[in-house]
Amino acid sequence: MDHQPRSRIHREKNARDRLIRLVNTHPDWALGFQDERWWSRFALPRLHTWSDTGDSLHLVEQSKRKDDPEPKALACYGILLRWMNADAQLHEEVWLRFVDGRPVSAITIQFLEWCCTKLEAKGKRVLAMVWDNASWHISKAVRRWLRQHNRQVKAAGHGVRILACYLPVKSPWLNPIEPKWLHAKRRTVEPNGTLSAHELADRICATFGCAHEDHLSISKEDS
């Protein structure tokens, strides 16, 4: 962060804060903090506990067997959503979609389409979305899709527009989904072996209280 002009950091943070305040005045808007995360089946977060003898206990990291056909890690798109209920109470939930592969622009677009469909069903008209400057967020394909999507929503008179707000580079503390990722990694640790990819995804979704949806993927022709 040291190499970034301080004025730019403040400007982008202020844009995020203005967007948050704006959402609070529109009951048919939703505020979304979007991010992606890799979930390893083998690497363990830093955890420790204590035995009855007072000795520190540590988890033992597992190794991938040669006959294990599943991936070492799963990529996941997530969005922390907040909106005001009819009784003026703040509502919050997390939506997740796992990926067969890695985050790319085409998958990002699929995820945003899915979010808009779900939000429209909940009566929302605008998704005010905060996210970082990952290449699959700022690519020409994603920016073009955002413009086209918003034009189509305006022309049709229904749907969910997206207002995208980009965070300063390397500023995870400005995205409140980040600590939720860390908390979930600690809660989904398997101390007695290795979870399959499906078991890991199930456990992560259960931690966030959301359904384990079909994984997002793209064809080889689109990759």
Predicted feature locations:
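C-terminal anion-handling pockets and recognition modules
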Residues: 27-29, 161, 170, 174-223
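Extended, low-complexity cationic-aromatic segments
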Residues: 11-114
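RNase H-like polynucleotidyl transferase catalytic core
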Residues: 56-66, 149-179, 192-193
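Short, basic/hydrophobic alpha-helical segments
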Residues: 107-128
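Short, solvent-exposed loop/turn segments at secondary-structure junctions
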Residues: 2, 36-40, 46, 81-85, ...
